[in-house]
């Protein structure tokens, strides 16, 4: 499943990535060359991923969020991402289809990987998101969601859960699709992320 360490992206991986993402062959090949230059082993570590993420958010602390994003895409749990996992991470966090993004968001919020989400896991991810919001932007948030605790509480109430309840993937996806307010609360301003990536 991994990539060859030569300078060419395998035809199978290229076709699979084109099919599953919005990226062109030219973009993928160019990114692959850059990826190999920065990661000659053909794999990116969590620390390297966090460094790349930090470039997009120089005025905040994206380390915790980047760590959770990395975990959610490290499908074989080897502590690295190959090029395919890396591109899918980029795609899902910027332009994936809504259902795919929600499946990914569930895996992001399912911190312990047990197949359900607890209120504490929601709080952990929301705290990581808040570290990426500038103090000026936090001041613009409504009073009932201007701290991680308030936002986590608001999300949990939208799902109609008690503090010690768990949320399944099905409930998470259906609840989010049925309520645009939940979608807004669980994500980190994807439009700003897209703009930063385009200008990088």
From Swiss-Prot:
Retina and pineal gland. One of its GO terms (cellular component) is dendrite. The keyword Phosphoprotein does not apply. Its main location: other. Ca(2+) binds at residue 116. It is a lipid-anchor. Ca(2+) 1 binds at residues 74, 76, 78, 80, 85. The N-terminal glycine is linked to one of four different types of acyl groups. The most abundant is myristoleate (14:1), but 14:0, 14:2, and 12:0 acyl residues are also present. The Ca(2+) induced exposure of the myristoyl group, known as the calcium-myristoyl switch, promotes RCVRN binding to the photoreceptor cell membranes only when intracellular Ca(2+) concentration is high. Oxidation on Cys-39 occurs in response to prolonged intense illumination and results in the formation of disulfide homodimers, and to a lesser extent disulfide-linked heterodimers. Homodimer; disulfide-linked. Homodimerization is caused by prolonged intense illumination. May form a complex composed of RHO, GRK1 and RCVRN in a Ca(2+)-dependent manner; RCVRN prevents the interaction between GRK1 and RHO. Interacts (via C-terminus) with GRK1 (via N-terminus); the interaction is Ca(2+)-dependent. Belongs to the recoverin family. This is Recoverin. It comes from Homo sapiens.
